[in-house]
């Protein structure tokens, strides 16, 4: 399956995954910041940062990708329908 076809056909899955990653980043940041007296846990900090960056990349990517597909694609002729028709004569 074409990965770009997945984004083109189901962009809502990517948006939901990006929102879930943002929620995970917020939860990890809250847990890290609630430990005021203890030293910061580097694992929670790295999970929070990585989740936030991936979520922002996914959400911005799907916004830019959908905008590109809407405004920048030209008319593409599907030539496969002509090649497979039974009435085509080869001369």
Swiss-Prot record:
It holds the Pfam family Pox_A14. This is Virion membrane protein A14 homolog. Residues 34-46 are virion surface. It is a multi-pass membrane protein. The chain crosses the membrane at residues 13-33, 47-67. Homodimer; disulfide-linked. Interacts with A17. GO terms for cellular component: membrane; viral envelope; virion membrane. Envelope protein which is a major component of the mature virion (MV) membrane. Essential for membrane biogenesis. Is required, together with A17, to form bona fide crescents, which can progress to form the immature virion (IV) membrane. A14 and A17 form a lattice that is stabilized by disulfide bonds and serves as an anchor within the viral membrane to which several other proteins important in virion structure and morphogenesis attach. Phosphorylated by viral F10 kinase, phosphorylation state is regulated by H1 phosphatase. It is found in: Virion membrane. The lineage of its organism: Viruses, Varidnaviria, Bamfordvirae, Nucleocytoviricota, Pokkesviricetes. Keywords: Disulfide bond, Membrane, Phosphoprotein, Transmembrane, Transmembrane helix, Viral envelope protein, Virion. Belongs to the chordopoxvirinae A14 family. Its main location: virion. Residues 1-12, 68-91 are intravirion. InterPro entries: Poxvirus_A14 (IPR008785).
